[in-house]
Amino acid sequence: MGKEYNIQEALKMAIQAEKDSMDFYRRASAATKNVRAKKVFELLANEEVGHLKSFFDHYKGGDFGDLKSFMESPPNKKNATYQALEKAISGETHEQAALEIALKEEKSCIEQYSVIVKDIIDPLVRAVFQKVVKETENHYALIEDEYMHVMKMVDKSDQDIYVRE
C-alpha cells in the first residue's frame, strides 16, 4: 500500500527543491561568461520553472503563497548547493565547478524522485513525478555534455566529426 498521506509532504519538498534548482541555475547563468554554458544554465532554469509549476498545481498547502510571488522570492542562500556555487564562482574555473555541482544535484534529484514515485497512489501526481524524473535525466545528459565541452573532451556535437575522420 502506498503512502498517500505523505503526498503533500513530497510535493512540498519537490517544490522547494525545484525552486532551489531554478535559483542555482539563474545564479550560475549570471556568473558564467562562456556563452554556451550560459545558455545551458538559462535553459535549465526555465525547465525548473516548469517542474515547479507542475508540482505547485497539485500542492494543497499554503506554505509558499502564490506561485508568482514564490518564484520571485529571494534564493535560499543557506542551501548547501547554492553556497557551493557561490564558493565556486570565486574561482577561475567556476563554469566547470558549477557543472560538477549541477551533475551531483540532478543525480540526487533523480534518485530521490524515483524513490518517491513508487509510493504515490494518485495517478496524476505520479505522472508528474515520472515526467520530472525523465526530464531530469535529460538535464543530467545535457549538463554532462556541456561539462565534456568545457573540459575540452569529446562531446555529442563533436562525435560525428570524429566518426567520419
What are these regions (language model features)?
Residues 1-165:
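Iron-associated oxidoreductase/ferritin-like identity signal
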